[in-house]
Amino acid sequence: MAVGKGFANRYLTNDEAAQIMREGLESLAVDGKRVLIIIPDGTRTMPMPLVFGLFEDLLAPRVTALDYLVALGTHQPMSEAQLSKLVGRPVTDGQAGKSHVFNHRWDDPATFVSLGVIPASEISEITGGLMAQDVPVRLNRLILDYDQLLICGPVFPHEVVGFS
């Protein structure tokens, strides 16, 4: 189900953003589940304090856990002061209220769990023959502790990877 709207001449109001999130989140089957939301770090611009507050208001009453993983890419971990600014609420000892806020530790091999390999033949097909090697699929092992993952963030052109 697609939910949303946009304008060429103005931003969404906070009320419009809240209504869109309400409509999108109410259909998710997350009641009683553990939910991890992957959010961008401080290098991506978006109204994260607004969005964080709406996730807390709209999902926290329905779930047994609502936590956040900051997608750092290869950036440095964010301090609690930086995390507090990012989410618009105090983050103390890795928590904002009842929610945990985790930095993705891309620089620590123990962070990852291997989920498999995309075979070279499939990579070759996807890339039109430009690349033909196995690609390991490794994700933050934290995701294994949750029933539902949500990815939240803007999409921007990126000077290295095309889009981020």
Where do the protein language model's features map onto the residues?
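Short glycine-rich or small-residue beta-strand-to-loop segments that form or flank ligand, phosphate
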Residues: 34-45, 67-73, 149-153
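Hydrophobic alpha/beta core scaffold segments
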Residues: 15, 54-61, 147-148, 162-163
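Short alpha-helical segments and helix-capping/turn motifs at coil-helix boundaries
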Residues: 20-23, 50-55, 131-143
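Glycine/threonine-rich flexible loop motifs
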Residues: 48, 159-164
